[in-house]
Amino acid sequence: MNLSDLYNRLKALFPLGELTEQRPALAFITLPAEFLRPTLRHLRDREGFTHLVLLTAVDWIEEGRFQLTYLLSNRTQACDIGLRVMIDRPASGLATMDSIHDVWPTAATYQRELREMFGIDFPGSPRLHEDFILEGWNDIPPYRRDFDTLKYAEASFNQRPGR
């Protein structure tokens, strides 16, 4: 599958941002968050991208935003496409993004992880408020760039002899 051709087909339907071709079988497209769900459904239902490989986040603290990347795979055509959306990163409280667990049920697991590690809420996603990895965590989410790992470690753990 030619990913530039796919991009042009999608651009005729949705207001897409730039296309970044990382290699012949992997490209990334930026798009407004409000067009993520219809674009995901189109890719799944009409273009053969039936596997959600991962959902991840990047904390762009300087810009006050998070970048969410939804990586999809078309196993028949042996290619992958990543959809990137930017959402606001509030100084306190949770960022918010629409859940896609009804499009890909496996997304619920990724969304739980992102809520716990980055503080991104996905309203309506199942089991979102249950501890996922960090049982009893009471600090800011540890993958946010303003989390001070050294300060946390010094306050939480004893020094080991010989270190």
Regions found by a protein language model. Name each.
Residues 1-163:
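Terminal low-complexity/charged segments
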